[in-house]
């Protein structure tokens, strides 16, 4: 079972997900205006860069946002259609942030808007129906698709999230109506605004974590902020859900109480131990991340050499996925597993 743990401080908020007492996911957000991913703005085209097929957009912040032409028009548009569409300096645009400011670079934005709800993601500019790949039951996928096709407005897209598995038509419709109301409010503010401005602010880390991860397999949500606790309870009036939300009032800091602080310290280490005695060595360069798998002290306890290697590699595959998620590592990743002779064993490692 999972536990969601929240540590809310004046400077920053930290959220963690534990699975059987072990750190599975972690996120941190500073309590300032620097994190703006998924915020929606009214912007003005400031400068067009034909050679890059891109433009700079004034969204009312200290640095202009950057947008590729391919992100300026609906995803359904073809290359030919995009080339025929005309942009001009001073033109107003409705954009959503997809990447925060970094160093001297402004945020990256798109005109393909998406609004996340509890059960669904609304895409107002694209006609599309999708169901999360994590819902694998074909009968359930078909049921959800039928419901979406009945309730989705023409010309808009709706993606059903994993947490929607098993929910009723009424619950999905209620979530959609909330998202449509939010979208209508954004459009009204866009029409009224005379200059670049913020139109919609994405939920903070606490509420995003609850929205995205508070599912039936979560045993408890524990936060050390009364304000955050009360906000979560307001979202879940059902006593069955609310009973799983708890305010932590202990004297020991909450991340120490749940041994999360110790786990976070290990995330700073280059060497990651494996349960068997093997280890991972994680190295970063400017271009890529390299992960080396070592058997180290593990001898296999009487197993054959190939069985020993397979066991270490299988442990490593699971732990590597966990480390990539916790360390937020992306881009090019090279993994050097211990050599295996049998192709079937190699395939099994890839599947794990």
Label every PLM stretch briefly.
Residues 1-352:
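DE-rich acidic low-complexity regions and acidic surface loops
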